[in-house]
């Protein structure tokens, strides 16, 4: 996602992936990120494991913007990235902001991956 004269918008995001349900992220309603996503109608995401053995997966596809974020998604992402206790505290402390967030679903069309534990040198 990019604007004229600028590089692509690349920022870390929390995500939730369930096969058949797409890659789900939540974004602020007035953010540059959601504005660019709406304009492009497509997105890509790359995630990696930096510890050995190095692995990554990249996915590209069309997006669906859902006007209200799903609390289950926010809860699962908070637990995944912050753990049970800190995730619960984050959700409570940010309840008003989270209630305004928008859900974006990336529907995978192309995948690329590397798993160096599977590479035979």
Task: Show which residues each predicted segment covers.
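Charged, gly/pro-rich active-site loop segments
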Residues: 55-121
């Amino acid at each position: 996602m990019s604007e004229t004269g600028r590089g692509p918008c690349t920022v870390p995001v929390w995500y939730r992936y369930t096969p058949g349900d797409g890659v789900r992220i939540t974004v602020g309603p007035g953010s540059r990120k959601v504005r660019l996503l709406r304009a492009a109608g497509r997105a890509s995401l790359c995630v990696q494991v930096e510890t050995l053995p190095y692995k990554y997966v990249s996915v590209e596809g069309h997006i669906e913007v859902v006007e209200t974020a799903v609390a289950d998604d926010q809860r699962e992402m908070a637990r995944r990235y912050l753990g049970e206790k800190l995730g619960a505290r984050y959700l409570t402390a940010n309840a008003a902001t989270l209630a305004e967030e928008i859900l974006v679903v990336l529907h995978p069309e192309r995948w690329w991956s590397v798993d160096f534990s599977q590479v035979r040198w």
